[in-house]
């Protein structure tokens, strides 16, 4: 079987609102194929807020 890896860093802050849902989809066009997600990870670094009280 052929295995593919997709890895991309995207600054989502520039494209989406503060609250979003993340997902994915796949297609082969008109043909049938089975897709297996063997690994999935999502990492977010949120800037902290400070209070001036």
Swiss-Prot record:
InterPro entries named among the record's database cross-references: ConA-like_dom_sf (IPR013320), Lectin_LegA_CS (IPR000985), Legume_lectin_dom (IPR001220)
Assembly and binders: Tetramer of two alpha and two beta chains.
Keyword Transmembrane helix applies: no
Species per Swiss-Prot/TrEMBL record: Lathyrus clymenum
Record protein name field: Lectin alpha chain
Molecular function as annotated in GO: carbohydrate binding
Similarity annotation: Belongs to the leguminous lectin family.
This protein's record includes keyword Metal-binding: no
Swiss-Prot/TrEMBL keywords: Lectin
Coiled coil, from the record: none
């Amino acid at each position: 079987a052929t295995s593919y890896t997709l890895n991309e860093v995207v600054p989502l802050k520039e494209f989406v609102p503060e609250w979003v849902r993340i997902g994915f989809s796949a297609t082969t066009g008109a043909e049938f194929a089975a897709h297996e997600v063997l690994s999935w990870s999502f990492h977010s670094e949120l800037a902290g807020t400070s209070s001036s009280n």
